């Protein structure tokens, strides 16, 4: 609740207007930018509650203040932080998207609306997990990437913020290898093996990564392992034919 209330100025530029010092919440809005000025304060608080939950953030993410600071001391009016300015633009973007959705020909789900949660899902940076892991692996190495992965898995597993299914580390490993970090890519696949033992597809990825460093023998062994785990794996069969190591 506190997290949501303290973000109440995100889009409105709210100021304490004709109020006693320290009064919170105020009785009215002024200096609004996106939310209509006539919107009841209680309704704005509810909107901000949703925004806060959707991004998993607190007051000081957008407003000038510190964690745990009393709300009457947070400077909600000043537009100092980039995150607050971005938030306003994102609200305008969401509004425009929903207006365009309503104009789609043949649309049947008339009640469907895009919200912050549609992309953010409880995180302030809405990117796929494989992108985050790839970025970290290519810039800081597999050890750092795996620390990030494990921390996120511990915090978010079972929620819809990130996809911890088998493809995530497979894709991250492949993209890391394409960036010239084959050894790091193989470490990502080793980690994935812990969560998905017996996977056939993972060994196809391993074989493809090994081919990137021209290790045909090791790649063939990986493709054979994929077939051992799933004799119908067509991609593994095709790769073996391509490298001249048919089953």
Q: Where would I find each of the regions flagged by the language model?
A:
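A conserved position within tetratricopeptide repeats
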Residues: 153, 157-160, 193, 227, ...
């Amino acid at each position: 609740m506190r997290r949501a209330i303290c973000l109440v100025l995100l889009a409105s530029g709210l100021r304490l207007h004709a109020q006693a010092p320290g009064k919170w919440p105020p009785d009215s809005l002024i200096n609004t930018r996106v939310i209509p000025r006539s919107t009841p304060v209680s309704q704005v608080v509810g909107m901000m509650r949703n925004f806060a939950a959707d991004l998993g953030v607190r007051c000081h993410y957008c407003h000038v203040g510190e964690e745990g600071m009393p709300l009457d001391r947070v400077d909600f009016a000043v537009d100092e932080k980039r995150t607050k300015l971005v938030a306003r633009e994102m609200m305008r973007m969401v509004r425009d998207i929903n207006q365009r959705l309503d104009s789609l020909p043949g649309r049947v789900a008339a009640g469907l609306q895009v919200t912050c949660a549609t992309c953010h899902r409880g995180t302030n940076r809405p990117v796929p997990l494989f992108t985050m892991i790839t970025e970290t692996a290519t810039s800081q190495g597999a050890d750092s990437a795996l620390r990030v992965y494990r921390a996120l898995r511990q915090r978010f597993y079972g929620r819809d913020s990130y996809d911890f299914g088998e493809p995530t580390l497979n894709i991250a490993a492949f993209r890391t290898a394409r960036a010239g970090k084959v050894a790091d890519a193989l470490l990502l696949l080793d980690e994935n093996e812990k969560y998905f033992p017996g996977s056939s597809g993972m060994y196809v990825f391993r074989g493809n990564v090994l081919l990137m460093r021209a290790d045909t023998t090791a790649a063939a062994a990986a493709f054979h392992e994929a077939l051992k785990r799933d004799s119908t794996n067509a991609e593994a069969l095709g790769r073996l034919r391509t490298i001249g190591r048919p089953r």
